[in-house]
Amino acid sequence: KASSIGVILEGVILIFILTLVIIGKQISSDFVILNATPIEWIILLTWLVGLYLIYKNPTLKNSKLLKEEKKLPAISKKKAHTALLIFTFCAIIVLISGVLLEMSSEEISNRFHISGVIFGATILAAVTSLPEISTGIASAKLKDYQMAVSDIIGGNAFLPVLLLVGSIISGTSIIKSIGPTDIYFTCLAILLTGIYLVGLIVKSKHQYLRLGYDSFAILMVYVLGLLGLLYIVK
């Protein structure tokens, strides 16, 4: 299972970063650095420090996974370069697809008179999660569960860093334009991450459909969170 100290550390860092987003919204200072507020730079610093702590985590160096990797045959440079090219190509495709999804989702929500918030929180969120789903399935087949979990948590931790990039490019601080719905989803993400971390520490002795109590709790809280979104939209 992926219940290692490294994954728990990733979850804690994610909670730190999401909390900083909420704090940044509440601070009404006009002081900016390269069009970005200090809190946006602190988010970047927190993310970088988190990467360093994960890299230096001693449990990762002695993990069973690394011991098994040492037994694997060496990969030729040609195969490694080919894999790198494929990885880069797929990353570019995902980037272009993200732009097209944003454009098409706005058109669909306007045409069918669907709230942009509702559409983005459900359909668009599910579609943009397809890379994580496919990566998770592939990692599960390889029995590399830690990679599957780290992909999800790491991706969520990196996204707030893009607030800094967006602020620098657009010329105005994006974190100041965050609305109540964004704060709501940020709090929901913190709550879900907290439940997940509890599930990693406190193991479920009983499972149903190969899912523990923590998984059902996460699903229930997420559904209730979406229902609560309806009251915010109103």
Where are these regions (language model features)?
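Hydrophobic alpha-helical segments, chiefly the membrane-spanning helices
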Residues: 1-234
